[in-house]
Amino acid sequence: MPRGLELLIAQTILQGFDAQYGRFLEVTSGAQQRFEQADWHAVQLAMKNRIHLYDHHVGLVVEQLRCITNGQSTDAAFLLRVKEHYTRLLPDYPRFEIAESFFNSVYCRLFDHRSLTPERLFIFSSQPERSFRTIPRPLAKDFHPDHGWESLLMRVISDLPLRLRWQNKSRDIHYIIRHLTETLGTDNLAESHLQVANELFYRNKAAWLVGKLITPSGTLPFLLPIHQTDDGELFIDTCLTTTAEASIVFGFARSYFMVYAPLPAALVEWLREILPGKTTAELYMAIGCQKHAKTESYREYLVYLQGCNEQFIEAPGIRGMVMLVFTLPGFDRVFKVIKDKFAPQKEMSAAHVRACYQLVKEHDRVGRMADTQEFENFVLEKRHISPALMELLLQEAAEKITDLGEQIVIRHLYIERRMVPLNIWLEQVEGQQLRDAIEEYGNAIRQLAAANIFPGDMLFKNFGVTRHGRVVFYDYDEICYMTEVNFRDIPPPRYPEDELASEPWYSVSPGDVFPEEFRHWLCADPRIGPLFEEMHADLFRADYWRALQNRIREGHVEDVYAYRRRQRFSVRYGEMLF
């Protein structure tokens, strides 16, 4: 290889990342127009396109590098020099942390995810102590109640870039003040002020104002979801001021926000104060930098592994027919490997399963489907694997495992947030907690269906409960679009003997679903059946599902709220006139 080629390759990779992030910002900057035009299908398409941008630009860079090197193979020493040159380009680079992840992605694509060592990749950051330099413009603006909170909030709302009319600005401001007074008290509120992010956070059919409520006793989140009426007028639906509420809004089961962030690291640091329970990976994920979030997630895993004295074990719950799931007892994530062979009733391929997981990655998850990170050639030290799990891995996924002596390499796996399986949760709770869980489960099914997702296998074991008590779907191998399903009523029996027969008296085609049958496995527990019949009996009717299908086919996009209905101003305070 000619001397100087290493620098050219390093510059080519960084220029490729510049192009990718430029397109990322370009797609993101269109969020305001899509919101104002109420073009919800364009919102969904932009979300999917933005996710695809990263891999597309990695592919472009890989092709450039193959042209530059004339397709010649490169030795380890050459690659190390490329990384050294790349590292030297980063100290003055504003998005160095994501540029490192982009380098990793290019390397993995070039070498088919082999030889993934710290010397060749940015397993850990090259600049861990780097502080954020002074940024050209502040991320947020402070508002003080010098003339009272009504005047303050009027200034906040008037500063917004949205060009639509407000339905009733005075009403919304009074709702917010009433909520803040109930939360803080009049005296504390008078001594508090706001710091509001300059950029709105767009997702689904809402534009979120994100800020900090700085009080005498500490800093709280200040979140305002802005929606549109059917007439295209703006209104504020609620005000959220607890870290638990903010955590759900920025949750791992939701689609990524579209927020214009030329300096994502600075935005992540700013958000950290109001989202103290979120890891760095989760914050990058929330603002759409999902590939760098994967890097940070892997780093968090390595740090935990180095500091613990645990072994991987099979994850608690009913063993899956498609996935082998394992975890570290104290770690908040699970590792999912597609089995070599599935149970007989699972008539599908591994490629189908991977396609289902990709569908979830790109679709609106409406707060009800867990996000995943996909890894290839994942290395595990044998000493970290319990004997029982090692035996299970070799029994169920031997074709995906390479034995390296002291280590094994798993060819492909997913990492996902760990939750308590819903079937286990239901066994452990009583009273109001049981009722809440059943209500949450039914709401999850409804919201998934409204987003054009049919879970397929609706058993409780395929859902998990988060630390905030939300029910989230996490088993995707039978997932499909609602519009692909044929929801049918069970025909009346022809003769009394039909109901006793081992085979149905009616024909069943692929894609047929009979909602009446859900009752058999969802209501079998006498503690659960009456609650389900009370709150979700319509889920057992085929006409309910067909009506949802019709709305989807007509192009209707349902509203998705990251908070309970009872928190909406219209429910809490009614239509008060001001």
From Swiss-Prot:
Subcellular location: Cytoplasm
This protein's record includes keyword Glycosyltransferase: no
A GO molecular-function descriptor: [isocitrate dehydrogenase (NADP+)] kinase activity
Residues noted as binding ATP in the record, renumbered to the chain: A315, P316, G317, I318, R319, G320, M321, K336
Active site residues according to the UniProt entry: D371
Family matches, as InterPro entries: AceK_kinase, AceK_regulatory, Isocitrate_DH_AceK
GO cellular component: cytoplasm
Keywords annotated in UniProt: ATP-binding, Cytoplasm, Glyoxylate bypass, Hydrolase, Kinase, Nucleotide-binding, Protein phosphatase, Serine/threonine-protein kinase, Transferase, Tricarboxylic acid cycle
Ranges annotated as spanning the membrane: none
EC number of this enzyme: 2.7.11.5, 3.1.3.-
Highest taxon of source: Bacteria
Family according to the record: Belongs to the AceK family.
Protein name: Isocitrate dehydrogenase kinase/phosphatase
